[in-house]
């Protein structure tokens, strides 16, 4: 590791100190554009809020860096396609941060399945039940932590007043910056089902139903959702992923 970038100065100082405690000296940046000018950086890991993923990845490949970007790779489908275009144009590597894909045990199970040793698989179903606490409800704009450069935090997202109790992490549960647990957790179940089935392309038919139930809070993304899709070129097979956190 040669550098760390974070728009929260407190977080940045803390992580730099952790590196020092282990005998590692790193450069510290609050602006990713400055980080990408650093010639000592060959590869970057992007673990920002979702709304920053695409722009950070595209800037990185344009700067000649390879990229490991946390899931979801992008905030929406269009952004994801732009990342692919940029990576191909600049001949850089962009890897999606899906830790399940790096599990040797899971990879062996996928191979076992694809070899037909369980017969023809007609349906794959992924389930996750994980209760999350309400993020609360506020009556108006909240103060942004003093250590945060809010302009840089918002980046490509609209710069709007903070309308929830907590800036960090709870960005997952509002649409301008997050995707809810569809992109935070359900993506693992959907990806595993597609991997197991060996899907070569996007599904021609997808049905998703859900909503935000149980809480009256400042969250806007679903906390309960079901996704059903038919794998491409296989109308007789289907995969399903269901997420519930209520």
Feature locations, PLM:
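N-terminal glycine-/serine-/threonine-rich beta1-alpha1-beta2 phosphate-ribose binding loop
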Residues: 1-69, 75-93
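Tryptophan-centric aromatic hotspots in well-structured domains and transmembrane helices
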Residues: 12, 50-52, 59, 68, ...
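A contiguous active-site-proximal alpha/beta segment in oxidoreductase catalytic domains
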Residues: 20, 66-68, 74-152
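Secondary-structure transition/capping motifs at alpha-helix termini
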Residues: 24, 64, 86-92, 115-119, ...
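Short beta-strand segments
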Residues: 45, 125-128, 207-210, 228, ...
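Glycine- and other small-residue-rich loops at beta-strand/loop junctions that grip anionic moieties
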Residues: 46, 72, 98, 182
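Rossmann-like dinucleotide-binding domain that binds NAD(P)(H)
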Residues: 151-237
């Amino acid at each position: 590791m040669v550098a760390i970038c974070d728009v929260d100065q407190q977080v940045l100082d803390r992580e730099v100190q952790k590196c020092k405690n282990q005998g590692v000296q790193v450069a510290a940046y609050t602006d990713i554009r400055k980080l990408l000018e650093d010639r000592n950086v060959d590869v970057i890991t992007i673990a920002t809020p979702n709304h920053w993923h695409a722009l950070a990845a595209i800037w990185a490949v344009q700067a000649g860096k390879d990229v490991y970007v946390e899931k979801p790779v992008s905030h929406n489908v269009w952004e994801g396609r732009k990342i692919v275009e940029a990576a191909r144009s600049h001949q850089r590597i962009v890897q999606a941060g899906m830790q399940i894909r790096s599990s040797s045990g899971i990879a062996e199970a996928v191979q076992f399945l694809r070899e037909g040793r369980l017969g023809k698989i007609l349906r794959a179903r992924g389930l996750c039940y994980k209760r999350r606490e309400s993020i609360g409800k506020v009556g108006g704009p909240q103060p942004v932590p003093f250590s945060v450069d809010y302009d840089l935090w918002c980046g490509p997202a609209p710069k709007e007043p903070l309308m929830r109790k907590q800036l960090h992490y709870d960005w997952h549960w509002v649409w301008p910056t997050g995707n809810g647990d569809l992109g935070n957790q359900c993506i693992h179940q959907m990806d595993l089902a597609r991997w197991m089935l060996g899907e070569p392309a996007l599904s021609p038919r997808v049905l998703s139903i859900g909503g935000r139930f149980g809480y009256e809070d400042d969250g806007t993304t679903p906390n309960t959702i079901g996704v059903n899709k038919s794998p491409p070129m296989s109308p007789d097979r289907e995969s399903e992923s269901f997420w519930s956190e209520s």
